[in-house]
Amino acid sequence: MKEIGFQFTIEAPDIDESFSPHMDVHLVPTFLAKNKARVFANKINSEVVIASDTVVILNNKILNKPIDRLDAISMLTELSGKTHLVITAVCLYSKTKMEVFDDRTEVTFKNLTRKEIEFFIDTCKPLDKAGAYGAQDCLTPGVNPCSHEEIDFLNSINKSDLIEKSLRGSQAGLGITIIQEINGSYFTVMGLPIHKVYSHLMNF
């Protein structure tokens, strides 16, 4: 957010992230983003809260963060050779109003061997990530993963180098290319669709 011109502080609210088993999985991130934002109802004055939640969905099932290495292997084996959906929902919240939106991106994995999966897990340590992967660690070196919409947005604010900055400290380029294609927003898969957040904030 700082890179696109907004000053902010980060707080991680302690909320119950459970939801009804009957809830449409595509609505879960919106439900959780709203709950995260409401935690700050009595803590803000003129500030705007930006709360978000990201889910990875395969075959109408949400893949959470793996509980251990074996669980991560199981998740990546399940994702191998398939296309899954990543949804990031964002809630903008102030004393006077609330606005919620989401962005949806399809991610296709290459066919992966057990050896490749284990190498990825041991190198990238993805146990803290939904679906057991972080997009920034899985990209083909030299390939811009952003959508045309994102590229146009970054160029319009003179931040075309933001892609490279997002990859610093990642494992991209170490031969761990497990993503075949991203159809939609790269930053949505990263956890925040910055082009949409910017647009909504400017009109909030």
Kindly give the residue locations of the regions a language model identified.
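Short, conserved active-site loops that position catalytic residues or coordinate cofactors/metal ions
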Residues: I10-I15, A51-T54
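Short loop/helix-cap segments at secondary-structure boundaries that form the rim of catalytic
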Residues: K2-I4, S20, N42-K43
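Short secondary-structure capping/turn micro-motifs that flank functional sites
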Residues: D16-S18, D137
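N-terminal G-site helix/loop of the GST-like fold
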Residues: M1-E11, H195, F204
